[in-house]
């Protein structure tokens, strides 16, 4: 039996974009947020748990840089680190997220402590960082292509949150506004790497699975938040109301 022919670049890009059907913008938790049905606790829980994702993104990108021998790719990819960590003397996305936390009524020190991060969220994010460390730099870079769908999710928050949640300080929306442009720029670079690297049908199918893996991570994070903040069944809820779960173990 002959091997299946590779998809053309246009067909491959179309297949990648079709994965947007599984993006977490469609998760009931996110739908509730942009439809105005989320409670203050649910929004605060989302902001607190997503902070763990935010602080780990630079570590993911640093792993890609460490594994990449191509200087030109590194020169462009390093901008992602600066976007989140900030350049010397400048704030980055992490500080912008802390301001979002303040805007929804969370203390920055509590966010930094990560005491509100649910185990399910921590496991999902850690799996993503570990994948980036162990995979080839091309596969790790391509896993970032959920950014294909990110501008829509940022815009949905900017469009709906001020209307539905007047108690949120509008200054907190800076992160979403900034990421609109950054995500579009990052998509161009990531898509170029992906379309150039995956040239056989088997490699293209593997890349689609990698993208699904990343979508699974984002969806699983919201599943954990749904259990805790919608169904009121956080970890160990049958035996205690205390947050007894681990707060991160250095390995």
Curated annotation (Swiss-Prot):
CDD domains: TenA_PqqC
Highest taxon in the source lineage: Bacteria
Protein's job: Ring cyclization and eight-electron oxidation of 3a-(2-amino-2-carboxyethyl)-4,5-dioxo-4,5,6,7,8,9-hexahydroquinoline-7,9-dicarboxylic-acid to PQQ.
Protein name, UniProt field: Pyrroloquinoline-quinone synthase
Gene3D superfamilies tied to this protein: Heme oxygenase-like
Cross-referenced HAMAP family: PQQ_syn_PqqC
Gene Ontology terms for molecular function: pyrroloquinoline-quinone synthase activity
């Amino acid at each position: 039996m002959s091997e299946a022919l590779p998809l053309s670049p246009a067909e491959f890009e179309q297949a990648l974009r079709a994965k947007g059907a599984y993006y977490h913008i469609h998760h009931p938790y996110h739908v509730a947020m942009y439809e105005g049905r989320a409670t203050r606790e649910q929004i605060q829980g989302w902001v607190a748990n997503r902070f763990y994702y935010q602080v780990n993104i630079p570590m993911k990108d640093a792993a890609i840089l460490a594994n990449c021998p191509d200087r030109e790719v590194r020169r462009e990819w390093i901008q992602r680190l600066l976007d989140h960590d900030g350049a010397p003397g400048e704030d980055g996305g992490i500080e912008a997220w802390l301001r979002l936390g303040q805007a929804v009524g969370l203390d920055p020190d509590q966010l930094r402590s990560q005491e509100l991060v649910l185990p399910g969220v921590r496991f999902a994010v850690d799996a993503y960082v570990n994948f980036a460390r162990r995979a080839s730099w091309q596969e790790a870079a391509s896993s970032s292509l959920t950014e294909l769908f990110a501008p829509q999710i940022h815009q949905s928050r900017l469009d709906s949150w001020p209307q539905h949640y007047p108690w949120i300080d509008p200054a907190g929306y800076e992160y979403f506004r900034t990421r609109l442009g950054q995500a579009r720029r990052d998509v161009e670079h990531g898509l170029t790497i992906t379309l150039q690297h995956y040239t056989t049908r088997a490699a293209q199918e593997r890349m689609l699975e990698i993208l699904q893996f990343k979508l699974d991570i984002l969806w699983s994070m919201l599943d954990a938040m749904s259990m805790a903040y919608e169904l009121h069944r956080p970890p160990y809820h049958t035996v205690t109301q205390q947050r007894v779960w681990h707060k991160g173990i250095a390995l």
